A protein has these predicted regions:
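Bacterial N-terminal signal peptides
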Residues: 6-17
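An acidic, Gly/Ser/Thr/Pro-rich helix-cap/linker signature
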Residues: 23-107
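Acidic helix-start/capping segments at beta-turn-to-alpha-helix junctions
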Residues: 49-70, 121-125, 135-138, 237-245
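Short, functionally critical alpha-helical segments immediately adjacent to catalytic or ligand/cofactor-binding
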Residues: 50-58, 113-128, 161-162, 219-220
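Secretory-pathway/luminal and periplasmic proteins that interact with or process carbohydrate-rich
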Residues: 58-65, 125-135, 146-151, 167-173, ...
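Substrate-binding/active-site groove segments that recognize
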Residues: 136-146, 183-198, 219
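Acidic, glycine-anchored loop motifs typical of Ca2+
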Residues: 199-208
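C-terminal soluble interaction/assembly domains
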Residues: 241-331
Length: 331
């Protein structure tokens, strides 16, 4: 073999090795901090953690995806069409009928309507059909160590997935999920799994990945723990006067918490189309249509839905899908 070709091949191999090494995290300084903390605080074996991070890979596709979430890049009428369509409704009715007994039990035990539970699972994963194609360890490592805007959050979730994997006897490299590290039918983050996931079929296993019954109970428990109020109105369509100031409408996640009363919104020109308690706290929302806007007042239970995903458009899709399913399923 000519010397020149040998040199090219050797350099190519070295470059490939260096590139692969750069895409792993075992030598990453931030990963070393996580390793140290897990060893000291949680009793992990250092060598096992080093081996895990040596296999964890940086994924640029994850960084690209989190920079362009649909709820931030699409107007309401396009975003809504992703989740409110005949296919998703048909699949939801099928799921509802298949697990009717378990859904009824969840509604009785947790006070959360069955249609809300099904709608969450439908919006999140098309009822388990699309639960994510990324290794969770890759997603959370990439976002913890290479996405500074939310590094603290994803670092915490990375620790949580390693803890739950150890505690549940699961290989952390086997867990699959979304680009953000969400897992299973209901797309629970690792901390949500540890805090809210439950064994709802009494088989002594908490399996939100393959067991829709556990997923049903876990979603219901999540909502109960976040303050769902049984029987209360979730949201009302509204009208808005031309004089209504733009500042009162939800613009970002910090605006989702209800701080004004229905009466105060009415005084500003945003009036509910159904009768509401004038003293109830609400949020006003303005969603873009192809022509013009539609207006809504979200109440306490609407806010609870946004605890699952901090987006008004997301919560509205969940609510509207739930109502479409309830209208089609005989109870």
């Amino acid at each position: 073999m000519p010397l020149r070709l040998k040199i090219i091949l050797v350099m190519s191999c070295l470059w490939t090795a260096l590139s692969c090494a750069a895409d792993n995290y075992d030598a990453n300084p931030s990963a070393q901090v996580v390793i140290d903390e897990l060893v000291v605080e949680e009793g992990f074996d250092r060598e096992q953690l080093i081996a895990i991070f040596a296999q964890a890979e940086r994924k640029d596709s994850i960084l690209n995806a989190i920079a362009r979430p649909a709820e931030k890049t699409k107007p309401w009428y396009e975003y809504r069409a992703i989740f409110l369509n005949d296919k998703r409704e048909d699949q939801g009715v099928e799921f509802f009928n298949r697990y009717r007994m378990e859904l009824d039990r969840a509604e009785r035990e947790f006070g959360v309507p069955a249609e809300i539970i099904v709608a969450i699972i439908g919006v999140e994963t098309s009822y388990g059909r699309v639960a994510g194609s990324y290794r969770v360890i890759d997603a959370l490592s990439t976002l913890a160590f290479d996405y500074p805007p939310r590094s603290p959050f994803f670092t915490s979730e990375l620790k949580n997935v390693l803890i739950l994997s150890r505690d549940q006897g699961i290989d952390p490299m086997s867990l699959m999920g979304s680009y953000a590290g969400a897992m299973g039918y209901g797309q629970f983050m690792p901390s949500s799994y540890r805090n809210y996931a439950i064994d709802f079929d009494n088989d002594d296993i908490v399996d939100i990945w393959n067991n829709p019954v556990d997923a049903i109970g876990s979603v219901a428990n999540y909502f109960k723990q976040h303050g769902w109020r049984t029987g209360e109105i979730v949201v009302s369509a509204a009208t808005a006067a031309k004089s209504t100031p733009e500042a009162i409408f939800v613009k970002n996640r910090k605006d989702l918490h209800p701080t004004r009363t229905v009466a105060q919104f009415a005084a500003e020109g945003v009036v509910a189309e159904i009768k509401l308690d004038p003293e109830a706290l609400a949020t006003a929302m303005k969603f873009e249509q192809k022509e013009g806007y539609e207006y809504w007042l979200g109440l306490h239970n609407f806010y609870v839905i946004t605890r699952y995903n901090h987006s008004a458009m997301y919560a509205m899709c969940v609510y509207q899908l739930s109502q479409a399913l309830a209208a089609r399923v005989a109870r």
